[in-house]
Every structure is written in structure tokens, then in C-alpha cells.
Amino acid sequence: MKLLRLCLDQIGVGRPLPWNVYNDAGQLVLRQGHIVRDEAQREGLILRGAYIDHQVHGEATDTQDLHAVREHSASLWQDVRTRAEALLLEPGEAEPFRRGMKVIGGHIEFAVVHHLDESLFELLHREGRNTPAVSHVIQAAFLANMVAIRLGWPNAMVRSTVHAALTMNLASLQRQNALHERARPLDVAERADMAEHGAQGRLLLEMLGVEDRDWLQAVAHHHPPEDGRSLTAWRHTAGDMACLLHHVDLYLAKVSSRAYRAALAPDVAARQLFHRGGGAANPFASALIKEVGLFPPGASVRLANGELAVVLRRGELAHLPEVCAVQGADGMALPQPVRRRTSEPAYKVVAAVPRGVVTLPAEAALH
């Protein structure tokens, strides 16, 4: 039996469970029809890990309305952003912090398994604007989860990676929010100062009672030293989790704009990451690009007929994503977004365009 992890808003208080619920060892915890009595029991299930049979879930979701799936995904990520902003900007006491991290990590794990394309769209096309530094680490945690699974890491290591991604900038979130709108890049002194935030973050996490050595190591070393050291040498010191976080962090920085520079198109960012990172010999860059693709959901693309479109889902083939045209070849917005078949010559994807150039109305994305 293949198990899929549940997230908080899939379990209703006072409502019968629609499936049997298992623990991570595959042992039955609650039978279908059991009524979760209160919020404490619901949250306790999530913290301990609540799972359902993959096959049963598949039968249930085959008939789900796509609109409902996408609405659920949008709601899920709004909840993640709200929780993450409260938890990361003001961590507070140790026990609530660790409990909150488990809940947020569970939400992200659930989204990777159940709503992968919809979540990529929400994160890359409709990122939160109030706290860009928090949005960045949420995006990093989601991508790191995807890539860690592709790399074949065990579940415990995947979860540690997600927690490390969420907290890799814990010591510098407020500063990074301010830097996001600054009109010039960091100077040498500022870069040296920022380079310490990994070690500072580790100290903060230790003060919050985090004892996971892999998590702490990844946060402390997710930025490689600027000493010309090779990936192999740095990987030996920092560990695989830190190396993965660095590559995810770098990719997201490339596809995000700043006040002093434009964003790169995702295909350009992917190629830069691949070639400058050592090509196929770099397992982290290779796995990231294979997972995200050249035209990920949320990316803006130009079609052969001159239209601009937004990618809704990855296709069976990397160059054939599902897209929705929003702007005509004349530069005018279309009256209504229109689905295009990228397998047809007129609607072939010829290039990606930088993030933020094209916006898809929310109602169009949900239908």
C-alpha cells in the first residue's frame, strides 16, 4: 500500500472521515467514518503524521472538479503564507515554533503529492507581495521537497530539507524584505555581513530547541564560501541538503526581479544554473531542472503566433505545456483568456518571458 500524507484542512472537525487513516508505518489509526471530535485531535493527527491509501485517494479524486482542486490549492497556500509569516518573523517560544514547523511542512508535503502543478502556479505566478522574503523560503521549501523526492532521499531527510529551506534565512528575513525594494545590489561589506546569516540562523534554531543535526547543518552552510572551492569539496563539508538548498535558492533568485535588475525567464535561468553549475555532473542542478522544467506552471511564454500566454500545467513532454493565451500578437489583452494547444504549430512555445510580464486573472486560472 502506497501512503499519501494528509494536511490539516483535509480533516474536518465534527465530520466523518471519508477514508481509513494510517500512521507512517502503515498501521490503521482511525477507521473510515470516525468523527474527529475537536481541533486538538485534528492537529495532533497532523503532527504525528496522518496518511491514506494512495489508490483510494486516486479513485476519489478522479471525479473531482478541477475548479475545486485549484480553489483548494489557492486556499492551502494562503494558509501556508499566513502561518509562515507569523511563525518565521516572530518565532516566539520553542514548543509552538517546532509544532508550527511540522504543520507547515506537512502542508507543503501534501501539496507536492496532491497539487503539484496547481501549487507551482500559485507559488511562481501569484507569489505573496507583503513579505517577499517569506514567500521566497516557502517557494524554496516546495521546490526542495520536489527535488529531494526525485533524488530518492528517505522521507525523514525530505522533511528535514523542507524545514531547513523554510528557516534558511531565519536570521535575516526582516533585512531581506527591506533589501527586496532597494535600488542597488549589496556591496562587498554588506555581502560579507549577509554571509553570516546561515550560522546566525543555526544559533537561533538551537535556541528554539531544534536538535535535528541535518536541518541545522543545512541552514548553517546553504551559501557556499566564495573561495573558489569546487562543488565536490564544498559538498563534502556542507552536506547534500545544504547543496540542494543553495541551488534552489539560486534558481529562485534568478527568476525573481529586484528593484535594480529584471528577472530572468525560467528557461534562461535553468540553462544558466545547469551550465554554470557543472552540467550533468551536478546532481542538484540537474534534478531541479528536470523537476521544474523549462516552462513551469506560472511561467509566461510567447507562442509562435505572437501571443503571450501563461503556463497552467506541465505537459507530457517538456516543450508541450498546457497554456492560456492572455495577450494577442498586437500587444492588446485578449477579451477572455483562451486555452491553446501547444502541439499545434501556430501555438508552439517559442520562448519563455520573465516573471511578472503576463498576469492571468484569478478566475481564469481556476477554470
Identify the residue ranges that each predicted region occupies.
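Hydrophobic alpha-helical segments characteristic of transmembrane helices
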Residues: 95-99, 248, 252, 257, ...
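Active-site-proximal alpha-helical segments within enzyme catalytic domains
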Residues: 194-197, 240-256, 263-272
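Histidine/acidic-rich helix-loop-helix segments that form or flank divalent-metal centers
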Residues: 165, 205-246, 260-261, 272-278, ...
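Membrane-cytosol interface segments
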Residues: 1-102, 346-367
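Acidic/His-rich, divalent-metal-binding segments that scaffold phosphate/diphosphate chemistry
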Residues: 61-195, 202, 206-209
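Conserved phosphate/pyrophosphate-binding and hydrolysis machinery centered on Walker-type P-loop NTPases
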Residues: 127-137, 160, 234-237, 241, ...
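Charged substrate- and nucleic-acid-binding regions of tRNA-handling and nucleotidyl-transfer enzymes
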Residues: 28-35, 40-44, 50-55, 308-313, ...
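Glycine-rich, small/acidic residue-mixed loop/short-helix segments
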Residues: 316-367
